[in-house]
């Protein structure tokens, strides 16, 4: 397997220096590229992320019901949230993919990016311990944990963007599918989202049109909050 370039730079972006860089390399390796891929690390990272976020919400909202806690956790650990984190880290620049995935734009696919985030969490746990993971994840999620509230319907990104623009009496966003790749059973959709307040369009890539629209809408919301 070829070495993945610029791992020290990625470590700085993540805020964690690996003692064993082979773990990070494995976390970035898709199953299409090598036998030693990231799926087991993803399994581990998914569980660690769930317990850390559950613990944070439990202590942050002592009066919240189990239902509210579950809904907030689902919002924070779902695929589109992980995809936004992956994009912030520019993980697509570091992924090791097989030729087929590379050709079909796998470095932009939301499921691959989200899985890579979970795999990196698993790799950090194996390289350190649960407490290190907890502190790092709370740093990654600081802004999202500060904004989330119980008792509030955890609306999807498209709904939130629409309501935000309507509140300002602005035109609604325009979504256009600009590319579809892959076989019928394994397609990748690229969707462009345009709004009047941004000079450039924002792109979302996912395994369905709806997911791609959600990803694009979430990125627009992030830009509008800056």
UniProtKB/Swiss-Prot annotation:
GO molecular function: double-stranded RNA binding; metal ion binding; ribonuclease III activity; rRNA binding
PROSITE patterns: DS_RBD, RNASE_3_1, RNASE_3_2
UniProt-listed GO biological process terms: mRNA processing; regulation of gene expression; rRNA processing; tRNA processing
Pfam families documented for this protein: dsrm (PF00035), Ribonucleas_3_3 (PF14622)
Keywords: Cytoplasm, Endonuclease, Hydrolase, Magnesium, Metal-binding, mRNA processing, Nuclease, RNA-binding, rRNA processing, rRNA-binding, tRNA processing
Gene3D superfamilies, A to Z: 3.30.160.20, Ribonuclease III domain (1.10.1520.10)
CDD domains in UniProt: DSRM_RNAse_III_family (cd10845), RIBOc (cd00593)
The reaction(s) this protein catalyses: Endonucleolytic cleavage to 5'-phosphomonoester
GO cellular component annotations of the record: cytoplasm
Domain DRBM: 156-226
Protein family according to the UniProt entry: Belongs to the ribonuclease III family.
Assembly and interaction partners: Homodimer.
Name of this protein: Ribonuclease 3
Organism for this UniProt entry: Shewanella sp. (strain MR-7)
């Amino acid at each position: 397997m070829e070495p993945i370039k610029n791992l020290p730079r990625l470590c700085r972006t993540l805020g964690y220096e690996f003692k064993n860089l082979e773990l990070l390399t494995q976390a970035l390796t898709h199953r299409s590229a090598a036998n030693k891929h990231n799926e087991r690390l993803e399994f581990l990272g998914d569980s660690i992320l769930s317990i850390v976020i559950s613990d944070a919400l439990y202590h942050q909202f002592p009066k919240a019901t189990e239902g509210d806690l579950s809904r907030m956790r689902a919002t924070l650990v779902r695929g589109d949230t992980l995809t936004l984190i992956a994009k912030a880290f520019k993980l697509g620049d570091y992924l090791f993919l097989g030729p087929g995935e590379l050709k079909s734009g796998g470095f932009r696919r939301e499921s691959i990016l989200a899985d890579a985030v979970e795999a990196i969490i698993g790799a950090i746990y194996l390289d350190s311990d649960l407490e290190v993971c907890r502190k790092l994840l709370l740093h990654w999620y600081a802004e999202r944990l500060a904004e989330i509230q119980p008792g509030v319907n955890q609306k999807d990104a498209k709904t939130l963007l629409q309501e935000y623009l309507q509140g300002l009496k602005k035109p609604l966003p325009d979504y256009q599918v600009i590319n579809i790749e892959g076989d019928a059973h394994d397609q990748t959709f690229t969707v462009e989202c345009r709004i009047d307040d941004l000079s450039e369009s924002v792109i979302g890539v996912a395994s369905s049109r709806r997911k791609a629209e959600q990803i694009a809408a979430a990125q627009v919301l992030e830009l509008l909050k800056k």
